[in-house]
A protein has these predicted regions:
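Alpha-helical transmembrane segments of multi-pass integral membrane proteins
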Residues: 95-96, 124-136, 165-176
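Membrane-helix and juxtamembrane interface regions of eukaryotic multi-pass membrane proteins
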Residues: 1-127
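Functional transmembrane or membrane-interface alpha-helices that line membrane-embedded catalytic
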Residues: 107-137, 144-149, 190-196, 212
Length: 291
């Protein structure tokens, strides 16, 4: 039973409309960050009555995407008369699920601390997730390749080799994203351990590590400030490749770039303000060898 008749899951006509809006609107929305300095999350979060607790807010703004995609994958094929989907569709849906199992569920659990998230930031993230998952999920469930010959045509000369290569690139990006996140987590774990030793020796309370920062130096952090962002781009580029360079996967990849690039740019300014130009200038921001 559809949750919203004609829209969730969408008819083909409505899916095409959503996909067009998704491609055109989010680059504009993401680019607003070049002129709006406020960002109520993470390093730049501030006290507000409209803040959500960090872990809860993160889960609530990340989980709608994978929930929507799985719902569409389980309902739309039957509505359009598809008995079974090719293995490629299931693999791509699985990759999406793996990513968000980490980002939506595991990530907030294993973070040593999380700053509050303003409800406006969370709301915009929910909108991103819903539009993206509706576009991708509908494509994988019914409106993209749904037979072996259609997949042969979509992948073209690259064939299965392109699909496998795309998956490999995806997993390289996923691993890079996780391990660079882990390096950021270790900064706060180390600070907490240091404080616990001091507290035990001097019988004082442990101070919160919510706002404890330093410039990380491990792995790609030696050369750039936001390798975890870059690795996420690598992930979704691989996904786009494996999908046969599909429009929904391209829109996801490009919209990630439009949203995250200005965030990295403002993040560099924050690092300079906190630690000085001398410690930051030798590092790229987000694209090695370019910016």
């Amino acid at each position: 039973m559809p949750l919203i008749e004609g829209w969730l899951p969408p008819t083909r006509e409505n899916w095409e409309t959503i996909t067009t809006v998704w491609q055109l609107s989010w680059p504009v929305f993401g680019s607003l960050q070049y002129v709006v300095n406020w960002y109520g999350m993470g390093k730049t979060s501030v006290q507000s009555r409209l803040n959500l607790p960090g872990r809860i807010g993160w889960f609530l703004m990340e989980i709608p995407g994978v929930a929507t995609l799985l719902y569409i994958m389980n309902t739309l094929p039957g509505q359009v008369g598809i008995d079974d989907l090719p293995w490629q569709n299931k693999v791509l849906a699985g990759l999406f699920t793996i990513h968000y199992a980490y980002r939506a569920v595991i990530f907030p659990i294993i973070q040593p601390s999380m700053s509050p998230i303003h409800i406006l930031v969370a709301s915009s993230a929910v909108a991103f997730q819903l539009m993206n998952a509706t576009c991708l999920g509908s494509y994988l469930a019914a409106y993209g390749p749904t037979t072996a010959p259609q997949w042969d045509k979509a992948l073209g000369l690259g064939g299965v080799a392109q699909f496998v290569a795309g998956i490999a690139v995806f997993y390289v990006g996923l691993a890079g994203n996780y391990f660079h996140d882990e390096e950021l987590r270790e900064i706060r774990r180390a600070e907490r351990r240091r404080q616990e030793k001091v507290a035990a020796r001097e019988k004082t309370a442990v101070v919160s590590v919510d706002k404890h920062y330093r410039i990380p130096e491990a792995m790609l952090f030696r050369y750039m400030l936001f390798p975890h962002y870059f690795c996420e781009w690598v992930e979704w580029f691989g996904f786009w490749m494996a999908s046969g360079w599909s429009v929904p996967a391209r829109a996801f990849f490009l919209n990630e770039v439009f949203v995250m690039f200005p965030r990295a740019r403002s993040g560099r300014r924050w690092y300079v303000e906190q630690f000085g130009e001398e410690k930051v200038r030798r590092k790229w921001t987000i694209i090695p060898g370019v910016y």
